[in-house]
Amino acid sequence: MRAPGMGFFRMPLFIWSLYGTAWIQLLATPVVGITFLMVVADRLLHIGFFDPAQGGDPILYQHLFWIYSHPAVYIMILPAMGAITEIITTFSHRTVFGYKAIAMSSLAIAFVGYLVWGHHMFTSGM
């Protein structure tokens, strides 16, 4: 909850980084849950999502793994980057140069970090 009169571009940069992280978690976490259910169904019910002998695709597992695991890196680093920015500005008694650019880049990192899992798939084929 923001204080009265606090607009979006007056919030601390830590909050911007948490906002980007929240969107990544909201979009990426269901994928890991679905992947887990598919692996359980594959192992216990012998459905064959990932078994080539049953018509499955092992590359699908790699895609589902990286669709979650690549954004997970940014889930860990974005809040730390926001916290470090706040700590440095607080103890140096200075304002942040390029506040809007840093706020938007936090969201851009979250957005792009979610979309670029494919670069992990170059060696196995897309």
Where are the language model's segments positioned?
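Membrane-embedded and interfacial regions of multi-pass energy-transducing membrane proteins
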Residues: 1-126
